[in-house]
């Protein structure tokens, strides 16, 4: 049976001398993996459509196991991302997180739209670090994680947040911050932005400007929380940390 799907390539794996296994996150079926025969050959009609982060329409011969990619029609090559090492690093983080967080053939149109919007915002020049933080925040419920971003994790009051507690699973107000000796001190902007990132419609994203220190604190909160409750290892995250460390 042949199926035409709209999707974004989120992973490629070389298979033999000339073939690739291409993982596509599709609007219709969620994550699907297909064999792209001959895609490693420079003159192959599948060479360009099977590149990482390519957005396109794919004609797939579906089966009980691995499908076969027959042909594709490119919508966007994400050229702006490919030509910039920073954009490539952040986009790689986003697609790898999507891959690791999802199961095969689980339809999720909301997640497809979020992935599509994030990558296209990146191509349009929106701060890639902020976009990656938004995406990482919005992936929390997809992974079954629901931290307290709206109220204190202990007293459940909406007031004066001064720290984030991984142990308690959310923000702490000034009255209860001392209860966790391993709390992460945060500024007021961190709470406001994380709550915003968690709830707002990504399609309504306008001009965004976040201070470097605020981004650093948000990244610390999210990474620490993911490490404790998620257990997903991302190679792309390590590369981002190296970029930041060496300020390439």
From Swiss-Prot:
Q: Which cysteines are joined by disulfide bonds?
A: none
Q: Name one GO cellular component term.
A: bacterial nucleoid
Q: Does the keyword Heme apply?
A: no
Q: Which UniProt keywords apply?
A: DNA damage, DNA recombination, DNA repair
Protein name per Swiss-Prot or TrEMBL: DNA repair protein RecO
| InterPro entries the UniProt entry points to | ARFGAP/RecO, DNA_rep/recomb_RecO_N, NA-bd_OB-fold, RecO, RecO_C
Matching entries from PANTHER family are given as: DNA REPAIR PROTEIN RECO
The UniProt entry, under Pfam families, shows:
RecO_C, RecO_N
Superkingdom is: Bacteria
Name the family the entry cites.
Belongs to the RecO family.
What role does it play? Involved in DNA repair and RecF pathway recombination.
Q: Does the keyword DNA damage apply?
A: yes
User: What stretch or stretches form a coiled coil here?
Assistant: none
NCBIfam families to which the protein is assigned, alphabetical: reco
* GO BP annotations listed: DNA recombination; double-strand break repair
Signal peptide start and end residues: none
Q: Which species?
A: Bacillus cytotoxicus (strain DSM 22905 / CIP 110041 / 391-98 / NVH 391-98)
